[in-house]
Amino acid sequence: MAAAAMAGAADPPHLTEAKKLEYFSSINSMARKIMQEREKIKETYGSAWSQMSPVEQDTAIDNGMMDPRIRARYAMHRVDRDEVICYPKLLIQTGQKIVHFGEEDLTWQDEHSAPFSWETKSQMDFSISNMTELFVPPSVNEPKPKTSQTTKPPSNDESSFWKISAERSRLDNEKAEFPSLTPSQIKSLEKGEKPLPSYLRLESGSRDMEEVPVSRPAKQRAPKPPAPPPPPPVPISMTPAAISVTPTPPAPVPSLEEGWERAQSTLPSVSSTTDEVFSPGLVTRSSSQSNSTVKDVEKAEASPASSPTFSQFNTSSSILKTGFDFLDNW
């Protein structure tokens, strides 16, 4: 830029004026007209223009662009005015129209009536200087109002909350005995009880954890008694519809499920009822044969029922599911 400035200073004056004319004329049409008027004024002064000072050149341009009669008219109406500190405000009285509504005696004043204004009367009368008068700061000598009359006494919940917060902050400073409060601890603090230290709470928690596994075996399900050995096989002679029941000998180590299946296999009433339902020979059977069959079945049932250990099994067709047997056979 320094080189360009030096090159511009080295150019002759007529080249500099030509560049100025070209630049300002290329801005817009108004600038081009102004530059043309300026060139006409320069031509009227001729060679004396280059000898004039910049102030004299500006005065000559102003006098050439504005008619002297117009300048004299403005000079006649020139009045010395006081300087206005703030922006001048148009003092008009708007909203002077009174509106009457129909036949009823309803009247109101139209705030936006003639003379019209976008602002209402209250908006036009508003001033910031009035606000400073309204908000006068109180003097230092004035006594302060009593806070006891204006302040509301804190409720019990708020007071307890602040007590708990103060207690917690104090304990946090003292190595933070409890990092977090549970609802039960908050209730105990509200009642005035002191919470247990952290090491005591840890021990009590560990004791509870130790007590839980000890008490669990007592709650476990009682083991089912082993299945009793089946009675010796008793041959039963029945009609073709009846079937002789011969229970299988027990295994060396009988399990609970095998004992239950074995006990059900020794129930002759179930097998007899099944045959009675599905055998076609029962349709022509006489009542005497049925009575003798029932007596034989009752004798067979009486022999296993005599043992005390076998009495826990139900020999009826509807097996009662009680206790843990219900869970095993669900």
UniProtKB/Swiss-Prot annotation:
Amino acid composition bias (Pro residues), ranges on this chain: 223-235
Stored PANTHER family: SIMILAR TO RIKEN CDNA 2310022B05
Region (Disordered): 136-160, 172-314
Protein name: Uncharacterized protein C1orf198 homolog
Record's compositionally biased regions (Low complexity): 236-246
InterPro entries, per the entry: DUF4706
UniProt biased composition (Polar residues): 263-276, 284-294, 304-314
